[in-house]
Amino acid sequence: MTAAAPRPLVVVGDVLLDQDIDGEATRLAPDAPAPVVDVDVDRSRPGGAGLAAMLAARQGREVVLVTALGDDTASQTVRNALTPGVRLVELPLDGTLPVKTRIRAGGRPLVRVDRGGGTPG
């Protein structure tokens, strides 16, 4: 008797691109009472269902992700980050992939900027 091959983990859901910008704010902008952040680190990674799929693949699981992706830069960044570890089953996306950008200074959140937000086609 042989053991059955492990089945892949199938993740279905919305993906977004998470961006984290970290730096230091030691001065205010001359044109507004807002901090100026000198960027030390700028990271991007899949978020939402993409993060769940990526973390499972890092643990050695075979993972299939079913999600909507488009032709925009954020979608391509997510594709590049997920392959080769995650097999993608892509649905069409009308519009652009959501991007959530968090800006921190000295380890403290200053602002989150949301962009994009297409709908599955």
Language-model features and meaning:
Residues 14:
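Active-site glycine-centered loops adjacent to acidic/histidine catalytic or metal-binding residues
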Residues 8-9, 17-121:
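Conserved N-terminal subdomain of the carbohydrate kinase-like
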Residues 1-5:
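A short acidic-Thr-Gly-centered motif at the start of a beta-strand
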